[in-house]
Amino acid sequence: GFPTGIVNREATWTYPQPDNVGQVTAKLAQKAYIGLAINSSLDGNNLSINAKVKIGYNYNTLKLAVYIIEDNLVYDQENYTSYYGGVSVLKNFKHHNVLRESLTNILGDQLPNENVGHDKLFERNFTYSIPPAYNKSNIKIVAFVTPGSSKAVLNVRGAKIGDEQSIEQK
């Protein structure tokens, strides 16, 4: 079907998307009450990840999702739009942010109740064996937090392998 953008997993991004960037920037301007940090290290093909969630509001439930994604995958891409000259197949198209693995349930794992509440900190470690066919220099880690009651993202953070992040919270 026709490619569709979803803003914050809630609303369809109005077509044509380049003319409606305000839908996205309005969401980005909202205050985040969740802080995230991703720290990782690599030993051979073994990736160790530490994800931290700092909570600045009294939520009832929260879920954390952690994904492994890869950039710069080159494959042909069907084109159903007038973009790129309207050709039907984009040869050697460079794909970014391709989901390679979900280290949690795809919709996130629920945080323990004792870790949900104002000024609480939750921390979880993950390990992942990167398949030899993947390009380690193109791998990124994405973590996001949702309320247990919806799929809306409260905050999201991405990191390259080896990044050391501190929690950023407004």
PLM regions: where:
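Short, conserved sequence motifs used for protein processing/export or organelle targeting and
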Residues: G1-K170
